[in-house]
Each structure stands twice: as C-alpha cells, then as structure tokens.
C-alpha cells in the first residue's frame, strides 16, 4: 500500500507541472492582441470559458487556427476530444496554472493524439487519459517531441496497444524522430503473475522501423508488454537508433515474458522470413529497472536481441524471480543478450558499469548465437566476490548458453558502480 501511495504521489506531482503562484481566472484569459480574427496565427489560445471570438474553444480548433510552426497554448481543464496534429507546432499547457490540461476523449479511440505531419511537433505539459489502441501516435516520417507530459490508459482493451508509439515500417527515404523526456506513463494494469487469463498487451513506448529516438528521464509503470520496445521494420530491414537513458521502470508485466526493455524484432517473425539486414545503435544507459511486485512474468529486465550498442550504468534490481519461465525469445536473466530465433548476433555490444543484483537464475545470460565474447567488465554482481555461474563468486550468475563465448567479466566491481562516475574498476 505504501508503494502504491508513493507511486500515486509521484504521478500526481509530475502531472501537475505547475508552480505555486496566484492563479488567474481562466474565464478572463483571452486571445493575445495580435490574434484577433483570421486563420494561420502564430499563437492561438485555447480556453473554452473565454467569450471572445479570437480564442479557440477546443484544442482541435486551436490546431486548425494556428499557423504552421506556431504555438497552441491550452488553459487547464478536461477536453473530451481526440486530436489530429497535421502541421508543425508546439502544443503546450499554460505554465503556472493550478490544474492540469487533460485530453480525455470519450469512447474507444485509435489514438487520443495522432501526429500526421513530417514537420516538428512539440507536446509539452499535457495529460492524456484514453481508452483504446494508442495514447500518442505517429506513423511514418514524423518528428515528435513529448516533454513533461503524462499518458494514462483507462480500461485498456485486450490485444496489443501502446501508450506512445512511433511506427515507420515503410521502406522510404524519410526517417521518423521521437523524443520523450521527463514524462510519466501508466498502463494502469493491476498486478499480473500469469498470462492466463489473458490481459492487455499494453506497451509503454514503442519505437519501430526507420526511427531515431531519445527516451530520457521517464517513469513507466504497469504495462502488459515491455515498458520500452525498440524494433526494426517488419521486413527486418532499415535503420533503427535509440538512446534509452535514465528511465525508471517498474511493474512491467510482459504477457509474452519478453522483458522490461525489449530490443529486437516483433513476434512472430515474418514468413517467409527475409534476410535480417536491419542496422542501428540502441544504447540502454542509466536506467533503473525493478520488479517490486515480484511478478513471474518478468523474465528479463533488458532483452537485447538485435542491433549494437552500450548496456551501461543500469540498475537491474530484483527483476527476475525464481518462478520466471523461458519464452520463445528469452531464457530468464537480468540482462539477456542474443537470439533464440536464429537472428544474427547483437554486435558490437558492451555490458559494463551496471549494478546487477537480486536476479534469480542469471544476472547476465548470453545466447548460443553470441559466439564472440562481449565486454561485461566492471559490473557489480551483488557480491564483492563477483558473479556466480561462469564466475568465481556468489553474486548474480553469468550464464553461457551452449555454443556461446564466455563474456569477459573480469575485472568486476567490488561495490555498486552504476551511479558513480567511475571509468574503471581496478
């Protein structure tokens, strides 16, 4: 109960996004002096309580009125509308107000906020409550930045869905771009310990295809899929790059037992299977990943099947339980590297300066296709004696699947290291 209350207070604190100050009456907030009449204005105010004709009464009306590259400022309140952003703009909650701006479309929606433009879109300070497939969604070569916002699922449906997703699966020359920072994502699922009976496969953030992404400083809770999912195009080609930095992940209940952070192709793989030609760099750095409810569904904290990059300075704390089971894409481990599905080895990759502690079965496990030794030095394994398994100590185990090369885990850290600035452990 205490953990739930703390989580609620953190969620409310971030969603408020407001400083303590005297609050103006929203009914008295009118349009800026330059925004009288006409279409295509640089700044548009949204205030359903305003009486003048120059102020938009809905967010969609404000989007339609503003010029490309302009700013839509939204006064506090709950807006029952699904939004389509079809031009570059900044959509922002007005700072300094006492209540949040909540986008809460009634009924079930395909997307509460859909971005349908290649031009840069900024979403700042909004709260999204929705029932349906997606909270915030962009398809194709979109350019979306989401800052200090909150996305909360309400009665999510069975089947696949996601709180925030950018999908670019078409083999074109354009690229998608996504930044999500300082935001709170809540899948709103109760504790799950088994895929039976089925529950919503709700992902936190999905980055797919020809996309460059930066996901930094977010809090993600109570999902039914991976809290973060980065995958290549569905044809197993293209280039996908992502930096997953400094996020706080907990209560990720992947119904497919894949992982809290999942890096690799979607399941099932296409049939007939094309050659895997996807390239990209996916860095997983400075994240804290827990399983505070001790769910058996968390078979890994980081499941790194494809691409190359750095897995560094993460805190992987008590994620894998003794009851965790293998799936078609992972054998239980705090950090899993490689593929059970016949894909090329993830490379080049380093696993360094992590705190890997309290994970049953394995702290690090490498798949059979990882035939070249990876650098796994300077990790803290929960014991000053080092890792167990392939290692000499009693800490979380290093497990090497048949045919794989043993990771280079020496030297190892003698104390927790992820939160330090250490560049060596000798």
Residue ranges and their predicted role:
Residues 89-135, 148, 155, 181-182, ...:
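Right-handed parallel beta-helix/beta-spiral solenoid domain characteristic of secreted/periplasmic
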């Amino acid at each position: 109960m205490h953990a739930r209350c703390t989580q609620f207070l953190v969620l409310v604190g971030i969603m408020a996004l407001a400083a303590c100050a005297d609050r103006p009456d929203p009914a008295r907030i009118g349009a800026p002096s330059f925004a009288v009449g006409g279409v295509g204005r640089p700044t548009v105010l949204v205030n359903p309580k305003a009486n003048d004709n120059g102020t938009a009464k809905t967010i969609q009306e404000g989007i339609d009125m503003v010029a490309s590259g302009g700013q839509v400022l939204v006064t506090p309140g709950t807006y029952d509308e699904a939004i389509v952003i079809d031009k570059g703009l900044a959509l922002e909650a007005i700072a300094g107000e006492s209540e949040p701006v909540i986008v809460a479309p009634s009924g079930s929606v395909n997307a509460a906020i859909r971005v349908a433009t290649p031009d840069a879109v900024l979403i700042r300070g909004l709260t999204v409550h929705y029932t349906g497939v997606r909270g915030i969604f962009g398809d194709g070569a979109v350019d979306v930045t989401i800052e200090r916002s909150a996305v909360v699922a309400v009665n999510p449906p069975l089947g696949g869905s996601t709180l925030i997703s950018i999908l670019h699966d078409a083999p074109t020359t354009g690229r998608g771009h996504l930044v999500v920072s300082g935001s709170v994502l809540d899948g709103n699922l109760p504790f799950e310990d088994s895929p039976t009976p089925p529950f919503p496969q709700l992902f936190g953030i999905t980055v797919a295809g020809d996309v460059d992404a930066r996901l930094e400083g977010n809090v993600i809770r109570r999902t039914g899929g991976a809290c973060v999912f980065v995958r290549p195009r569905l044809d197993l080609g293209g280039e996908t790059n992502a930096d997953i930095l400094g996020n706080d992940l907990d209560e990720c209940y992947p119904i497919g037992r894949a992982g809290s952070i999942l890096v690799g192709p979607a399941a099932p793989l296409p049939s007939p299977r094309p050659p895997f030609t996807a390239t990209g760099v996916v860095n997983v750095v400075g994240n804290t990943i827990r399983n505070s409810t001790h769910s058996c569904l968390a078979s890994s904290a980081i499941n790194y099947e494809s691409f190359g990059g750095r897995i560094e300075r993460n805190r992987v704390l008590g994620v894998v339980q003794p009851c965790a089971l293998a799936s078609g894409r992972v054998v239980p481990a705090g950090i899993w590297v490689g593929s059970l599905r016949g894909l090329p080895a993830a490379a080049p990759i380093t696993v360094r300066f992590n705190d890997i502690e309290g994970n049953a079965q394995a702290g690090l496990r490498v798949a059979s296709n990882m035939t070249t030794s990876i650098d796994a030095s300077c990790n803290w394994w929960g014991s000053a004696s080092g890792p167990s398994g392939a290692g000499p100590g009693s800490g979380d185990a290093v497990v090497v699947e048949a045919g794989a090369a043993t990771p280079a885990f020496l030297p190892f850290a003698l104390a927790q290291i992820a939160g330090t600035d250490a560049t060596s452990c000798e």
